Amino acid sequence: MTAADPDDIAKQAREHAWNWFALHATQRMQALNFFVVATAFLIAAYASILEKHPAAAAVLALAGAWLTFWFNRLDARSYQLVEAGEDALRVSQARLASLADNQSLMILDALDEPAPGASSYRRVITVIQSTIFALFLLGALYAIRLSLM
């Protein structure tokens, strides 16, 4: 039995880490896109039934808030999976930077903190989802108020 080539193992590790990262980062953006589209449909439905059926609009708004909550939880998990891929890629980047004698190849380490004035994806997604959650709740309260008049 021959010993495994360390360079081959390092290459396999890098490919595995990259595939993991790419899969979960793509899924995260697709989930966000689906959330935005679903939110647009819910808002359109809410607006179209609000005047004639305010109780139904309230239920729809509460369903939107509920879905927003769960999309936020799903994004938190996706964030964790993406971070796991980044952690694995850091090792490959450190090895590559050392072999190439080029510390600029440690890209993830250089980008740990967003630039001044920039925000992380996690922060932006959370702010968007929190705002939509609050708007759905306010919409539900407004529809309930209309239904009681």
Task: Describe the role of every protein-language-model region.
Residues 40-43, 64-71, 132-143:
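Helical transmembrane-bundle signal
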